[in-house]
Amino acid sequence: MPPWPASYGVTGFAAHPAFTPAPYSAPHASQHPSFTRDLPPGRAYARRRAHPDRSLDMKRIALAALASLLAAQPAYAQSILRDAETESMFADMSVPLVKAAGLSPRDVRVVLINDDSINAFVAGGQTVYVHSGLLQAAVNANQVQGVIAHELGHIADGHVVLADAGIKPAMHITLLSMVLGLAAVAAGAGEAGAGLMALGQAAGMGKYLSFSRTQESAADAAGARYLTTAGITGKGMLSFFKTLQQQEYRYGVENIDPFMQTHPLSGERIAHLTADLQASPAWNTPSDPALEERFRRVKAKLEGYVMTPDRTLKDYPETDSSIYGHYARAYAFHKAGYPDKADAESRALIKADPNDPYFQEIRGQILLEAGRPADAIAPLRAATEGTRNNALIATTFGHALIATEDKANYPEAIKVLRVATGRDDENPFAWYQLGTVYELSGDTARAALATAERASMQGDHRTAAQSARYALANIPANTSDWIRAQDIAMAAQNDMDDNPKKYKKR
C-alpha cells in the first residue's frame, strides 16, 4: 500500500507547509491586530537590491535601517489549509462582493492559512488570505464577509502595486538622513550624525506608516460600498472591528501610538464607517441563514482540526448531539488516535443527512487514513458524485482506489484523477497520485508527464524538463498529452537557460 504523504492532512483539511506568502509579525503591545495586506517593506526592498546601482551601498544602508524598523519579527512559513466545504463557503460568500468590486469571481480566490492569529491580507494578484484564527474569532459569516470586503478593496484599488508610492518617499527620507549623518560623522560630529540618522529613520518610517493607514482607510470605505452594493448588511464589519478593539484594550490602548501603526485604530475605523453602513438599505437585512449554518459547520470542523483534542472535547463535549458537535469530535478523535470513535461520529453525521456529500467525505477519509481503503471507497464515491467531482474530494477518492492495491480499481482511479487535475492543476498531491497509478498500470510515459506537471508547479524545472522529454519520446505525437509535455519541456528549458547559475551542476 502506498504510504500516506506526510503533507496530507487528516480528514478534509490538507496542509501545504511550503507556502510562505509574506513575513508576518504577531500583534504585541505596540501593534494592534487588524486586517493586514501586502508584502512587508523588507521583502519589497530585497527585490530592489537585485538591480545594480552606483549608489547601491548607500541605498543598502538606508534600506536596511528602514526595513529593520518596519519588520517587527522574522518571517516564518505559513501553511495553506485546503478543504472542499470551506472553499465552497468562501466562494459563495464572496461572489456578490467580488461582483460589487467590479472583479470576476473566476479570478478571485479566498485561501485559508493555518495561523491562529486574527488576520487577513492580500499579497499581490487576486487572492485573499484568511487566517484560521480569524475564522475562529468570528461569530458569524457576516463578519467574515466584512473582512473579505475590506481585502477586496485593496485588490480593486491596486494597493499592492501602489505600495512603492509609499515606500519610495520613506526610502528617500532615510537615505538623505544617512548621507547627512555620515557627513556629520566624517566632520567629527559623531553624536550629531547619529542623531540625524535616527531622526531620518523615524521620519521615513512615519512617512510609510501614514501612507499605509491611508490605504487601510480607503479599503475600509471600499469594503463598505461593496457590502451596500451587494445588499449585505455591514453589521458584521462593525462588530468585527469591535472585536479587534477589544484586543487593543487588552494590550492597553493608552500604550499604542496611533502614528506608529500600519492601520488606523479600530475605534477610528468604527467611527468613520458607522454612519455610512447604517445608512445603507441593507443595514437591517438579515444575514443569509443557509450561509450562517455553513459557517457554523466549518468553524466546528476547523476547531477539530487545528485545536488539541482536549480543547475540542471541552468545547464540544460528547453530550453535544448537534451537527457541530459530531463534526468537531470526528476530527478530534481522529487526531487523538481513536478511529472507532471518529467513525462513530461520522456515522452520526450521515444518519442525520445521508445525502450530505461532506459527511460522506469525512467518513471516507477517516476510514482511508485508518488503513481501510476498501471501506472508504463507497462514501468517497458518494462524496465525489455529490459535489459534482470536486477536485479535492475526487483526489482523495482516487487515493483510496489506489490504496486498495486492487488492479481492477486503477482504471477508475486514472479517470477520477484526470478529472481532478483538470479542474485543479495546482494540487501537487493529485499529480503525485495520478503519476503513481499510471506507474502501477505500466504507463510510464504518462507517469513521467504527471511527474513533470508536479515538478513544474513546484519550481523544479530540471526534473520537469527531464520527465517531460521522456513523456514526449513515448506518448503518441500531436495528442493532447504530447502537446502538454512539449509545453512543459520548453518552459522548463527556458527557465534553465535564463538562470544558468541556479541549475549549474555541483
Give short role names for the model-derived ranges.
Residues F333, L367, L401-T404, Y438, ...:
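Residue at a conserved register position within TPR or TPR-like alpha-solenoid repeats
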Residues I270, P373-A374, D406-Y410, L440-L449, ...:
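Alpha-helical linker/edge segments of TPR/alpha-solenoid repeat scaffolds
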Residues I323, P357-Y358, A391-L392, P428-F429, ...:
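Helix-start (N-cap) detector for alpha-helical repeat units in TPR-like alpha-solenoids
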Residues L152-P169, A187:
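Catalytic Zn2+-binding segment of zinc metalloproteases
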